[in-house]
Amino acid sequence: MLKNAFSKKFKFKNWPKKNFPAVAAGIYVIWDEQTLLYVNTAGKDLDKAQRAGKTKFGLITRLNSHASGRAASDQFCSFLANRIVIPSITSGQLSKFRDGSVTLDQMTKKYIRANVEYQYLVVDKFQDALDLEGHCKRGAIFGEKPLFNPLD
């Protein structure tokens, strides 16, 4: 089965993972316990990045962005903030937002580091990642569609 080609699950609390491929194209999936949250690809212009001598590109930079918790600049973080973090904010936490002692990005990053895991698969051809992404988003690989970005 294709799902067995993916890495094991790694916790974002341990990001960055040792020995993670520094320059690589691929597909990744993000989990909250047993719920598939998000599927995406990274590394579209891998050849160009390699020719330019980039030392970090593709999967590592995308997952690093997700680990940051910055909702304004990262689609996954925006989905997570809007669908999971904001609905769980308590009245006590709201007062901390008002006085500036807590930000949405801080809460999103905290949630990611405490609860979220990722898996990835490095590919030689980016088109393979795109093809697999469609299958994952339709529920064909993991038996469920991602909560945040499914395809019909």
Q: Which residue ranges define each predicted feature?
A:
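GIY-YIG nuclease catalytic motif and its immediate N-terminal context
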Residues: 1-57, 61-97, 121-152
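Alpha-helix-centered segments that form part of catalytic cores
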Residues: 97-119
